[in-house]
Design a protein with these regions (language model features):
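C-terminal substrate-recognition regions of SAM-dependent nucleic acid methyltransferases
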Residues: 1-185
Length: 186
């Protein structure tokens, strides 16, 4: 069942590193052109427990003060502050939610263990990556591979980086990955 519709089909089995919520020939085609394509460069999605909210709780507070002045992203809706900078405090990053629905955003601060991130070389690259990661294809791939209200970090680490100048026109990325009209409409 996907989007309240029941599907029945057979697909030739192949070894997988993950289990999608639905798997048929169309899904297999989409995944083989994107996250399963080992020839494509992948986003370097990272995690960090440098300032873990619970094991390093003495360094973290909910409110910003003169002592706790370093902004940390805990979840997309929760920001906390630390008394020391995170080892990745500086520089623009794309943050991707792991504990809620798929969402991506840019900031230039640190983080706790509850969110993943991509370090960007500058704000321009961050904006470019953000636009790509918000594309319906990436949202779709994430959503068919999420379990128990959690986004799968291994799937996020398999997201390919297109090597084209993406203008924001969705069809450009579909064309880049050779996604057919039938696959798009699925």
């Amino acid at each position: 069942i996907w989007k309240k519709k029941e599907y029945v089909s057979s697909v030739i089995s192949k070894q997988r590193k993950y289990i999608p919520l639905l798997y048929n020939q169309i899904f297999q085609n989409i995944l083989s052109k994107t996250i399963d394509n080992t020839t494509l460069p992948k986003f370097e999605v990272k995690t960090s427990s440098d300032l873990h909210k619970y094991t390093k709780a003495e360094f973290i507070r909910d409110e910003k003060t003169e002592q706790f002045k370093y902004k940390l992203i805990h979840t997309p809706s929760q920001t906390v502050y630390s008394s020391r900078p995170h080892k990745f405090q500086e520089g623009y990053k794309i943050f991707i939610s792991t504990t809620d629905k798929y969402s991506v955003f840019i900031d230039n601060c640190g983080m706790t263990q509850s969110i993943v991130f991509i370090i960007c070389s500058n704000e321009e690259q961050a904006k470019k990556y953000l636009q790509i990661l918000q594309h319906p294809l990436y949202v779709f791939i994430n959503n068919i591979c999420r379990w128990g209200n959690f986004n799968n970090i291994r799937i996020l680490q398999s997201f390919p980086i297109p090597t084209i100048e993406y203008s924001g026109n969705h069809q450009e990325l579909y064309n880049y990955f050779n996604i057919t009209k039938e696959e798009i409409e699925y």
